Amino acid sequence: MRSSRSDIRRCFGCRFPKVLSPTHSKSGARPAIHGKLAPYCKRLTVIDVVPRAIARTRQRMKESSHINWIVADVRQFSTQQLFDLIVVAEVLYYLEDVAAIRTAVHNLVSMLAPSGHMVFGSAIDANCRRWGHVAGTETVIAMLNETLIEVEQLYCRGASVNEDCLLSRFQKSTT
């Protein structure tokens, strides 16, 4: 499940002017994903609910001037800016219930530009429930399919069943 810089470019097909990447400080992969995204966007906005996590990741990223760091909850973050790409990975299953996940999904979709893309990745529902979370990727994908068009999906099988996850790319309609 490794990716290289060329994999990122091939996946997205182009550079994105404005990118949003909500994070959750309990997930350890955040600096890696931001490091992979940063070269492909003119403006990267990173949000996390924990100030210390933002500070730590910001320090690792060497204060890149085109990255905007914001302490905020993914359910309440608000901006007039629309994003060309929103990357949500290993974030939503930390929320307390399906209603909170739905609120976050609705909020994120509202910030997606017309024809914008959303890449969503998470552990599968069965793994998330085994870990004590309310939902995983299949639940969120169903929510995203209510308002976005699913363009592609990739099932990632890990070394153990606990590592299985789904990645999906969605696009917002222009109408």
Swiss-Prot record:
Pfam families: NodS
S-S pairs: none
EC number: 2.1.1.-
InterPro entries membership: NodS (IPR020944), SAM-dependent_MTases_sf (IPR029063), SAM-MeTfrase_NodS-like (IPR008715)
SUPFAM superfamilies in alphabetical order: S-adenosyl-L-methionine-dependent methyltransferases
One function term, GO molecular function aspect: S-adenosylmethionine-dependent methyltransferase activity
GO BP: methylation; oligosaccharide biosynthetic process
Keywords, comma-separated and alphabetical: Methyltransferase, Nodulation, Transferase
UniProt function note: SAM-utilizing methyltransferase involved in nod factor synthesis.
Similarity comment: Belongs to the NodS family.
Protein name: Nodulation protein S
Underlying gene: nodS
